[in-house]
Amino acid sequence: MSKFHKTISRRDFMKGLGLAGAGIGAVAASAPVFHDIDELVSSEANSTKDQPWYVKHREHFDPTITVDWDIFDRYDGYQHKGVYEGPPDAPFTSWGNRLQVRMSGEEQKKRILAAKKERFPGWDGGLHGRGDQRADALFYAVTQPFPGSGEEGHGLFQPYPDQPGKFYARWGLYGPPHDSAPPDGSVPKWEGTPEDNFLMLRAAAKYFGAGGVGALNLADPKCKKLIYKKAQPMTLGKGTYSEIGGPGMIDAKIYPKVPDHAVPINFKEADYSYYNDAEWVIPTKCESIFTFTLPQPQELNKRTGGIAGAGSYTVYKDFARVGTLVQMFIKYLGYHALYWPIGWGPGGCFTTFDGQGEQGRTGAAIHWKFGSSQRGSERVITDLPIAPTPPIDAGMFEFCKTCYICRDVCVSGGVHQEDEPTWDSGNWWNVQGYLGYRTDWSGCHNQCGMCQSSCPFTYLGLENASLVHKIVKGVVANTTVFNSFFTNMEKALGYGDLTMENSNWWKEEGPIYGFDPGT
């Protein structure tokens, strides 16, 4: 079959968009030369980062947000619990103790539901505020243990003791022993270049189900500042045991009970990671962090607060699955793999520094491919040498300065209100030392998600997106001249319009796992 090519100039390109004139020079000066449309659409930045030409790479630890590394430091609040439980030095008590800094769950839920009924007249939230019985059934299905698992969970995964619907890797940070390991417990180390190792992990992680991947150099002092100062060892309930072992996989041990309070995370020379009542140690020989994100089902996401919750919880369950599979893969190569879904540090922070996205107005990261409809980055700390991936500039951070869609739909008013980024949010639970967008997370509730759903970048990569949408991304990445115009077009065309209407979703044959293959 012959491939059709049509030669077209940049000016003709922009004329087709109706944008010829001011700003052409800005785009032309920074864009590479393409002979035809096919070359532009199919081009990639390089072999290790499957990103299009307009996603520009920056220097390591120099993202589009401005960071003052003299001020920026490790966050004292662990697992984001500072938002829910009071001052950063407060001991871990329970997930229910959130009244110190945010209203109770029921009160907040009523507030969110009232706002949605006002925004969507005639909508009936049903028994639990998600819609009809089908919506509740879908949510129930994805928040239960895996089929046939009973109360103890299934295989490598198990429900959180006090967080219904969320799963963790039940063998803890190190993963379980493996039946195919050599009898003596030793595994020869895989020998590969850091670049080849990254490509290998990317292939494996995407096969397991990851959406995007990245890597960071933990040996860099700046990278260490992304790790929490303290945490509760393991993502388990307080006072429980966890079986962990070294990279040989056969030599598993029963370690002490998990402390019921946060302990410092320290970097020390050690053969294995360990913890006790005084500290938790990460071996300094573990100099790489492999990261991955998972996209959320876009059509579910648009039905904010309805069946959208099922899409969100599906991703949390998959985090445990994909993360543990990546962990096991690295272990059988003969290396340590310390997997902790949310415990190493703020997820959006890693996504911003590892080149998978840029910080957006919501304070969370916007993925260059999946937009705001993604979760991560998940992190696996390892001594396998991995080439780090640099931060990117795709124009998204700048775009958010003139796009207020997520701010306008936010029920709690927590999304960054000012036009420009700021150094200080005034909230003690936000990390200081960077010029970025600040969100008051204390008002958020898991029955919402409007900011993610309404983000224009979430829908620019859908299957039914036209060639124009791909060009829009290229223009946004190279000039800010048309940002306001594109925002107005987004509002007019309604790609990210929110809805509480679920009936059509039940009648349509959706893509596998709800992910649009166009992404």
Swiss-Prot record:
This is Chloroethene reductive dehalogenase. The lineage of its organism: Bacteria, Bacillati, Chloroflexota, Dehalococcoidia, Dehalococcoidales. Pfam families: Dehalogenase (PF13486). Binds 2 [4Fe-4S] clusters. Residues 388-420, 435-465 form the 4Fe-4S ferredoxin-type domain. Predicted to be exported by the Tat system. The position of the signal peptide cleavage has been experimentally proven. [4Fe-4S] cluster 1 binds at residues 400, 403, 406, 455. GO terms for molecular function: 4 iron, 4 sulfur cluster binding; metal ion binding; oxidoreductase activity.
